[in-house]
Amino acid sequence: MVTVYSKNNCMQCKMVKKWLSEHEIAFNEINIDEQPEFVEKVIEMGFRAAPVITKDDFAFSGFRPSELAKLA
């Protein structure tokens, strides 16, 4: 399952979620503004900015369609 760590008012987060929905890729969203207990996990993965997208051991940050396509 794909997980998207997002933040409020994050344009790249919105773009990632829209892209995944348009390509019918199911995802679970964790909003780190609303669930701050996940901030440390994102930092431990080596990321400092949202969105962070993960699936199994694959993770990346930002709106990157070429990487999003690998999640299908």
UniProtKB/Swiss-Prot annotation:
Residues 1-72 form the Glutaredoxin domain. CDD domains: NrdH. It comes from the Bacteria. One of its GO terms (molecular function) is electron transfer activity. This is Glutaredoxin-like protein NrdH. Belongs to the glutaredoxin family. Pfam families: Glutaredoxin. Electron transport system for the ribonucleotide reductase system NrdEF. Disulfide bonds join C10-C13. It comes from Lactococcus lactis subsp. cremoris (strain MG1363). PANTHER family: GLUTAREDOXIN (PTHR34386), GLUTAREDOXIN-LIKE PROTEIN NRDH (PTHR34386:SF1). One of its GO terms (biological process) is cell redox homeostasis. Keywords: Disulfide bond, Electron transport, Redox-active center, Transport.
